[in-house]
Amino acid sequence: MNADFLGLLLLYLTILLCAAPLLGRHIRQAMNGERTWLTAWGQPLERGLYRLAGVDPAAEMDWRRYAVAMLVFNVLGVLAVYALQRLQGWLPLNPAGLPGVAPDSALNTAISFVTNTNWQGYAGESTMSYLTQMLALTVQNFVSAATGIAVLIALVRGLARHSAATLGNFWADLVRATLYVLLPLSFILALALVSQGVVQNLDPYVEAQTVQAQQYETARLDAQGQPMTGPAGQPLTDTVVTRVQTLPMGPVASQEAIKLLGTNGGGFFNANSAHPYENPNAWSNLLEMLAILLIPAALCWTFGEMVGSRRQGVAILAAMTVLFAGFAASAAYFEQQPTPALRQAEAALLADGGNLEGKEARFGVAATALFATVTTAASCGAVNGMHDSFSALGGVTPLLQMQLGEVIYGGVGSGLYGMLAFAILAVFIAGLMIGRTPEYLGKKIEALDMQMVALVILATPALVLAGTAVAVLADAGRAGVLNPGAHGFSEILYAMSSAANNNGSAFAGLSANTPFYNVLLGLAMWFGRYTIIVAILALAGSLAAKPRLPASVGGMPTTGPLFVALLVGAVLLVGALTYVPALALGPVAEHLQP
């Protein structure tokens, strides 16, 4: 770790934490239906959408109706995205003439984008038409993020209300989050990215003649244009030599903006934010990192204002920031170390370079390590370098942040409702230690509440570890591993952790675009998203129905340093210890290998 990284981290956190209160206040006003600076143009459109859908925004729902509405909306989203992918060969805005996507890949991608995961087993520029990118994937980038915000707001209402039976209206929350939060921010960010060189057009791909011949491996396709696999399920490839380079075009900036602001992460291009058309320079890189954590940080402020105590939100934000800074420093330290080859050559510990494998020269080690920490602290998954090329211990940072449940800032909405589950757990543990009935924000924490909290915390580890075991035991799972041994195990563990925790990034050495992995990861994404959401809504309904208790002497304060420390400890101990055996078999074993 050097001065470059420390300066970048300090600049990043300063801008982020200064912007969070301003946006957080705006989100609170928008989600409560109060007047904002966007009301003049947004309210007529909002009312028109309600009339078109036949929705009464004032008709509130209990937690069960809220959950059913959310699930129905998301199931319809999966069907729409699947259909657009399968039919894209016959639809317009397809200048490259790309065929329909294979059924298993289309299903995996549909689940991926609807669940806010954006896991991509395909290369966007060679698989998806412009229409599919815009109408299917970009639309889901908006509404999946809005779903996360809506569920969080429902939980916050459950904490803020007392003796109540309802949590709000899902349709109203969905529309307001999209119209007043996501759309305006995305418009501003898209313009900023275009100013830095991110492409935004509907032009056909450009073919350029190169001076030197290029040789690369490409997937072998069958008569229907779908990837072929061998007898053991391994992908088949062909070697291609060419002097023609195809430069992909497309409406990149508009998708890039919501990909980041909605903590979605799915890139327009296969290289994601390492591609110069998505992330051209250091300024665009800083903007993209800020966009990823802006709304998750702001929602902490929204939470504090909605429950009537800003200090409650600041305490949660402080715990997130402490964890984030520690993981960022860890990633930078291990990536700045010499690679084994450099160490054998007796390179200086802090010599220029460090582990530059898999990193863009225009970003370097510091910006790549920070971006990796940002994208896995959030459930984003966008990358500006190759995580598979991180050192064994450097790769632990993005892996472990996902395994903690994506609560260090976390995804839009999902990060904070996950962290609030840990906050309730921390209060429960404190209550056991001092022999008092646990309370949080004046609500008594009872058996049903702790059952839902336990489900939120344990659902994803169960999916990750069970899925990893299935992949390791199955022939089709092992066939996708291109790097056998400890690192190959890490690649499978990373893929399952990313899918179940709705992150979407990858150790890309795993060949995951096969029927086996498309189905396995699709199931992990679906249940990793909606098991937790339903449990959170049940928790919100339980809390809303409780009377508010007056503050008692000797109660656990939830706004001071002691609570922050207890919350950080709960996240690390309960979240991280679950994965110690798996981490020992993967990155730790790889690090200890000679």
UniProtKB/Swiss-Prot annotation:
Disulfide bonds: none annotated. InterPro entries: KdpA (IPR004623). It is a multi-pass membrane protein. The chain crosses the membrane at residues 3-23, 67-87, 136-156, 179-199, 287-307, 314-334, 415-435, 453-473, 519-539, 562-582. Keywords: Cell inner membrane, Cell membrane, Ion transport, Membrane, Potassium, Potassium transport, Transmembrane, Transmembrane helix, Transport. It is found in: Cell inner membrane. NCBIfam families: kdpA. This is Potassium-transporting ATPase potassium-binding subunit.
